[in-house]
From Swiss-Prot:
Its EC number is 1.-.-.-. Keywords: Monooxygenase, Oxidoreductase. Oxidoreductase; part of the gene cluster that mediates the biosynthesis of sterigmatocystin (ST), a polyketide-derived furanocoumarin which is part of the most toxic and carcinogenic compounds among the known mycotoxins. The first step in the biosynthesis of sterigmatocystin is the production of hexanoate by the fatty acid synthase (FAS) units stcJ and stcK. The polyketide backbone is assembled by the non-reducing polyketide synthase stcA by condensation of the starter hexanoyl-CoA and 7 malonyl-CoA extender units followed by cyclization and release of norsolorinic acid. InterPro entries: NAD(P)-bd_dom, NAD(P)-bd_dom_sf. Pfam families: NAD_binding_10 (PF13460). Pathway: Mycotoxin biosynthesis; sterigmatocystin biosynthesis. GO terms for biological process: sterigmatocystin biosynthetic process. It is an enzyme of class 1 (oxidoreductase). It comes from Emericella nidulans (strain FGSC A4 / ATCC 38163 / CBS 112.46 / NRRL 194 / M139). One of its GO terms (molecular function) is monooxygenase activity. The gene is stcQ. This is Oxidoreductase stcQ. Induction: The genes forming the sterigmatocystin biosynthesis cluster are co-regulated and induced on oatmeal porridge or the fungal isolates were grown either on oatmeal porridge or in YEC medium (0.2% yeast extract, 5.0% corn steep liquor). Expression is positively regulated by the cluster-specific transcription factor aflR that binds the palindromic sequence 5'-TCG(N5)CGA-3'found in the promoter.
Length: 274
């Protein structure tokens, strides 16, 4: 049966993927979803259908819980790496930590069963990391947008390089959308040469599921985008706020301690993870 793991199931993209898969499970009972998150209660709050679905299993814990992540990934056909944060946190390593945890888990599973069929990895990234996807964006605007998310993009680029280095035994696709908004699904298209802003999280999720279902190797180690099939009416106004704060955190990273969304790690905590 088709089986999917969603790492970061309570985030904006993760919950949208869970919802898209649950909608499909209504008509295809073979589908199984493994939702990995830090809080089961939050998952049920942001995606109420998950609480009663027989097609979904919740794996609650941290990414450094080896046995839990092994259990979550075992037997899946595709894994969505969508753990993310919303602002430009200095020293962010969320994408890299997720990539390392998944690679380590798949290595353990392969060591236990050398004949195991490994899942395809579908990784959330950004169009700003693929210059050809942003050809229609004026250079000054692109510079501002890229600088406002500089710490996150550095993390995403490092994770992508790390995963590409595993191409001899892993299959991965890097999904790089434009600006995202909370809006209804309007239809989507997987695109190889451009991105488009705005794009709804639900359309992004549907596109990522389409990529995950492509088992013919067409997206192996490729960068793709998802574009809306029709114009999205909602403008990403919250992006304006995050652009201003992101620029502040880029040029004055010390201000994040007072204005950022998340708690900064201490040097001791970073050294412990390394």
């Amino acid at each position: 049966m088709p089986s999917y793991a969603v790492l970061g199931a309570t985030g904006n993209t993760g919950r949208a993927i869970v919802q898209v898969l649950l909608d499909r499970a209504d008509t295809d009972t073979r589908i199984h979803i493994c939702a990995y998150c830090r809080s089961k209660e939050k998952l049920f709050r942001v995606c109420p259908a998950a609480e009663t679905s027989k097609s979904l299993s919740v794996f609650q814990g941290r990414l450094d819980d080896d046995s839990l992540i092994d259990e979550c990934l075992r037997g899946t056909d595709a894994v969505f790496l969508v753990v993310a944060i919303v602002d430009n946190m200095p020293g962010c390593t969320v994408a890299m930590q997720t990539a390392e945890a998944v690679v380590a888990s798949l290595q353990r599973l392969r060591a236990t069963d050398p004949a195991i069929r490994l899942p395809r990895l579908v990784i959330l990234s950004s169009a700003s990391l693929e210059p050809t996807f942003c050809n229609d964006v004026p250079a000054p605007v692109h510079w501002v947008l890229k600088t406002a998310v500089s710490h996150l993009y550095r993390d995403l680029a490092a994770a992508e390089a790390y995963l590409r280095a595993q191409s001899d035994w892993l299959s991965a696709t890097f999904v790089k959308p434009g600006g995202l908004v909370h809006d209804q699904a309007r239809g989507h298209k997987v695109c190889l040469d451009r991105a488009q802003t705005p794009l709804s999280f639900l359309d992004l999720a549907a596109g990522m599921v389409e990529v995950a279902d492509a088992d013919d190797g067409r997206y192996h180690m490729r960068s793709v985008s998802v574009v809306p099939a029709s114009r999205v009416a909602i403008f990403p106004w919250d992006g304006v706020y995050y652009t201003f704060t992101g620029l502040l955190f880029h040029f004055c990273p010390w201000t994040y301690r007072f204005l950022g969304e998340y708690k900064l790690q201490s040097r001791k905590e970073r050294d412990k993870q390394a």
